[in-house]
Amino acid sequence: MREYKLVVLGSGGVGKSALTVQFVQGIFVEKYDPTIEDSYRKQVEVDAQQCMLEILDTAGTEQFTAMRDLYMKNGQGFALVYSITAQSTFNDLQDLREQILRVKDTDDVPMILVGNKCDLEDERVVGKEQGQNLARQWSNCAFLESSAKSKINVNEIFYDLVRQINRKTPVPGKARKKSSCQLL
């Protein structure tokens, strides 16, 4: 079974842990408890393929930024999360993306831009178009709006990253099955 190392990044309070826990355990975490680092594992089926996802839920606070290079070096796919209710969290993502590209030393990194808390439409300050435009600027990066509370697009975030990783590095063994050996 193929393993995938996914990393959830973004400012403090955007809902990184809420999205991760909702995906892994099906629970909405109501209380905000700043994360230092949590790792979760979940087996899922994506496109008829069994996958083991290792999801690293990272700290959003500035005091743990030294650990980020290590997450970025080891991660295969990245969810960059902002809150649609806080413009500053959206603005912070440009630097995070640049750091990922610098650490990975390539522009071709599986990544998805996530506007979280879309259930709080009354409090929205970051328009959906802003997210779509930024994703386009980022070499047509994938983009979704989500809500951990309302279970909107939660699974899709992680499945999309798996699909991007599969496109970038096809599943070992699949290519071999296509070729055949003929003995005469």
UniProtKB/Swiss-Prot annotation:
The highest taxon in the source lineage is Eukaryota
Question: In the Enzyme Commission scheme, what number(s) does this protein have?
Answer: 3.6.5.2
Q: Which GO terms describe its biological process?
A: calcium-ion regulated exocytosis; cell population proliferation; cellular response to cAMP; cellular response to forskolin; cellular response to gonadotropin-releasing hormone; establishment of endothelial barrier; establishment of localization in cell; modification of postsynaptic structure
Main localisation, per the record? membrane
The EC category is: hydrolase
The pro-peptide lies at 182-184
Q: Which NCBIfam families does its entry note?
A: small_GTP
Describe the family membership recorded for this protein in Swiss-Prot or TrEMBL.
Belongs to the small GTPase superfamily. Ras family.
Protein name per its UniProtKB record: Ras-related protein Rap-1b
The record lists the lineage as: Eukaryota, Metazoa, Chordata, Craniata, Vertebrata
